[in-house]
Amino acid sequence: MPPDQRPVEFVSNNIIRQEFNRMQVEIRANLGELSKILSRNSHLAHPPEGIPYCTNSQIIYYYEQGNNLLAVAHQYLLPDGSLGGSGKPDPKRLVLSDRILAVRSAAPAHPNQV
């Protein structure tokens, strides 16, 4: 089913994280099985509490072969090069075969993958 015809199911952060982990999205990206594209990289002028100055807020798009969008995640890149929070990307959107999982704060869908 094309992504534009799949229903969107809004779920909790825990549910989307479980599915992201089950699908091994970050592991597959690190192995080169998925393309990982940095879509946004913004320096935080006023970082949230507990996040150091000079931290960047990043949106990452994960693509399967054939340029099919699989996932969208957010992460804080700390000044030392490590990731803030849990130390892992925070999934916001996950494209499954029959539906799209999303959290309400999700980044907008890629223009070609609405």
Language model regions located:
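Catalytic toxin/effector domains delivered as secreted proteins or via bacterial secretion systems
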Residues: P2-V114
